[in-house]
């Protein structure tokens, strides 16, 4: 039976709006759990998206938190971008930095309307790609992986990213629900730790390592209803999945909040990089440059 270690011992349980990290030392595995409620509603409220796009963005935001939670330095940022030249969705962007989350979708409304109520990932994007970028703090560098946007969901595409770009066996589960109380979304990410590969055959060439197979089977048993159950804490989910393990260490991560970083100062700095003749073309009749933030839908009037 597992020993659930938390730091500190008296830490409250986590239900929503905060990341939960866990490790299973005996299986060389780590994981992240998150459930979004009010923060998700706040982000979505900035846009008037139709249901398929709302569902897509909700899943993407969960994935951004799960992947961002793998980077321990609060100053680091993870950006997920899905793009195509032929689909109803032209661009999806989400990023996560130190608990701050934001995202938006650019899409063709007319083409989307032709797809029906529950379009597949391929119907939304056509032939596209998924780019995931880790900008590490303190000068530790920046790295990016790009994979085809394939599978039945964004979660499957992210699994493929970890397999192909980082050679890390990964299982991801996401769940999204819309009802009268708003939109709720949650996710689980479990990985085989790189340290577990030392002295063994590389897992990206042989994905049937018994430790990983065992963890993946347990994690894969998680139901969408459990992920979304507001009365079930994230610690309880980890316990249900892995209670037979020798030890499961859990740690509460960052609180999640909407975090758009747009500002007049930021846009002025960007505009000042343009030649004066270009800025003149941008100004309206009042001499103001109007800038729209795609993430939060605010409009800024910049004198520059």
Regions found by a protein language model. Give the residues of each.
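Cys/His-clustered metal-coordination modules, chiefly Zn-binding fingers
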Residues: 216-304
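Interaction interfaces in information-processing and related assembly proteins
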Residues: 2-251
